[in-house]
Regions:
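N-terminal accessory segments
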Residues: 1-34, 53-61, 66-68
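N-terminal glycine-rich flavin-associated loop
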Residues: 29-61, 85-131
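Short glycine-biased active-site loop of nucleotidyltransferases that positions the nucleotide triphosphate
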Residues: 30, 71-77
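Short, glycine/charge-rich beta-strand/loop segments that flank catalytic centers
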Residues: 64-72, 126-136
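Short beta-strand-to-turn element immediately C-terminal to the catalytic PLP-Schiff-base lysine
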Residues: 73-75, 104, 140-141
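Short basic, glycine-rich beta-strand/loop surfaces that mediate nucleic-acid
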Residues: 78-85
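Extended, low-hydrophobicity, polar/charged segments
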Residues: 109, 138-142
Length: 142
């Protein structure tokens, strides 16, 4: 496969996803490795587009939630795209009588607990920095 660069990747994104481009910052650093591009998608469709285009351009992607535990696991030698999921922070469905809730990956544990508290419920897990730790990150790390 021909090696393509991140500039071509950015040009190929839909206008709505280009609006979610940000400059990489210290927030995106993983053990001193910084991406070239940072994206903050607003929907699962935008995540799908991001990953599809990144694959097409042979780019390495790292998902980032609350960025609370990025140093855990194998250190990347490089990555091209930071896929920041903290804008995906909605409750999709809540059925208190069934004790079930469906949420997006970027919702923080703190925000989820506040939502559940409205019905005198809670999620029986804890995580450091609950106001920043996302459900997606907590589940990924364990």
């Amino acid at each position: 496969m021909e090696q393509k660069n991140t500039a071509d990747f950015v040009k190929s994104l839909s206008p709505s996803l280009k609006d979610e481009l940000t400059s990489p910052s210290d927030y995106h650093l993983i053990d001193d490795v910084s991406p070239t591009v940072a994206l903050s998608p607003l929907s699962t469709e935008q995540i799908s587009e991001s990953l599809s285009k990144a694959s097409e351009y042979d780019l390495k992607v790292c998902p980032i939630g609350g960025a609370t535990r990025l140093a855990i696991g194998n250190k990347p030698t490089q990555y091209d795209v930071a896929l920041t999921l903290n804008k995906l922070d909605k409750v999709i469905d809540c059925k208190p009588s069934d004790l079930s809730i469906t949420v997006q990956a970027g919702i923080t544990l703190g925000k989820l607990q506040k939502q559940l508290q409205k019905n005198n419920q809670f999620l029986p897990i804890s995580a450091p920095l609950a106001q920043r730790s996302t459900i997606g990150g907590i589940l990924a790390i364990g």
